[in-house]
Amino acid sequence: MKIIFFLTAIMLPAIAFSQNLNQKATDQKKNNEMLIGYCNRDGFKTIDSNFDSAYLAEYKVYRTDLATMKLLSQKLKGVNVTLVMATWCGDSKEWVPRFYKIMDELNFNHKKLTVICVDREKKAPGTIAAGLNVDKVPTFIFYRKKTELGRIIEVPSDLLEKDITVILSK
């Protein structure tokens, strides 16, 4: 009986969270589907828009800077990332696949990544988005021990991996 209670206590939140993952809404401006709320990469394939094809194309062609990647790999320990993005956003279509490419090459644990897709008002009901003070997307927020280290807002100032390295060097 204790085992059943223990498994229920562990599995129920995971099931509840997964049911709210990759929710869809209609983008009123373009009348397209968009993701809203907590999402993951699998959600990109589920919406009726060009986000997934743009994502796949950008992911495929992006080449990381190897010297920077070596430095960055040493700085990822204990890092969590929150990504606020929008599937309707051109900058998200460009920078989110590059971010995933960087993290994939570094074998980043994607359980330490929270992705929130917002609408055109930068809102995502049922998420922490309102408390993050995000005005532009994508916004990449980097944390270590629940302390925000820095953000990349909309477009990096240099190569994305270089900006991440600078933030994680703090």
Describe the role of every protein-language-model region.
Residues 73-105:
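Local sequence-structure signature of Cys/Sec-based thiol-disulfide redox active-site neighborhoods
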Residues 94-97, 127, 162:
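Generic recognition of short, well-ordered alpha-helical segments
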Residues 81-87, 110-124:
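Thiol-based oxidoreductase modules, predominantly thioredoxin-like and allied folds used
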Residues 121-135:
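Short Fe-S-cluster ligation motifs
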